[in-house]
Amino acid sequence: MKPHRTRFLTISAVTAATAMVVAACSSSGSTNTSGNGNAKPVVIGASLSLTGDFSADGQAFKRGYELWASEVNKTGGLLGRKVQLVFQNDASDPTTVATNYTKLIAQQKVNLVFGPFSTLLTVPAAKVAARYGYAFPEGAGGGPAVYQLKLPNVFNPSPPIADQLVPFADWVAALPATERPKTAAYPQVNDPFADPMTEAAQSILQKAGVRTVYSKIYPAENPDYKAGADAVAATGAQMVVLGSVDVPTATAFIQAFEQQHYNPKIFAASSGPDQGADFVKAVGAKNTNGIMVPNGWYAGLPNPLSQAFVKAYVAKYGGSPSDINADSAEGYSVGEITAAAVKATHSVDNKKIISFLHSSVTLQTVQGPVKFNSVGENVVAQKFIFQWQTGPKFVQVLPSSASGSVPIVNPKPAWSS
């Protein structure tokens, strides 16, 4: 293992790296965005899943990163220098993501890096960044597998995922016995993001007397979700808690359930339904009704920074607030904490940025307050449960006492067919 070290870039090195990136874009698949100005840009590199299983999320993160850079550049950039983003496509592959960050840091010599999508890809990527002494702000690697590494350079402004379904499970457990489902199914992808939160919910619900009639983790390679969904339907479980990581996984189960005329009274998924217009388009507006999902952000969040983000997003990309994928807000938050650190330290020195983010300072982002512990978890993160309701509208339902929460639709309405 190579020793940890920080690389300091001279102005000429940044210029050379920038020229190399621009020259390579047409042949390597990299893309870059930058503002105008005479000062040399602050070059920030990121590997994202622009193709492959996580491509919808990767594209959403890219929009979040790009919107942040655009907004920052409108006000003069960082330290009076425009921000330039450089992207590499990891095709949703853990080996490729490690190669990409090595290339960004060691060859292209970017000033800073942002993280990829998913816990699966964050683990190898963060190790590379740590080896070179780079701060690693990221918004989608919230699984225990990331924090168990105990790396000093990881900082995630999004909520830790292990307990994100706890508010949902507590709500079900507290239902009157006549309303509480008696049986539940827990189909899960083999993923370090989905599994911890699904299993935490299952533990709470079993203690509340909800009997598990199906629990299976599908292999990462060539999972047969259609067969799995049919097996869940055959149990007649009154509740389904789906450990999913993306829109395609959630869609596969929903479509199979509809074909089987199986409609659980309560249906929650760990991810997929939080992805706005992408989810609605995939399953149909009527089939979203009643589905629940955890997250730390939605377009109606009563947060001035979030409201400004929503306005800027719609102005740049079009559509309506409900179309915005929560991944874009997570990516934008990564930019916000980075900007705060750069401004506070008056530098793009990764060692200083790491030290600042570990100083117990509380920062404000579109997702709410952020304060990091020693392993980079946001210990003051807001956790919400959302539900799709008639419209379709994506609304906050839990905690019920939180500002902006509306009553839960229970039981879930029937599928559109």
Give the predicted meaning of each segment.
Residues 1-43, 74, 412-417:
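Short, low-complexity disordered leader/linker segments with a strong preference
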Residues 56, 60-67, 71, 96-103, ...:
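Extracytoplasmic/secreted proteins, especially bacterial periplasmic and envelope-associated proteins
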Residues 4, 31-34, 43, 56-61, ...:
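Beta-alpha junction/loop-to-helix N-cap segments that form part of ligand/metal-binding clefts
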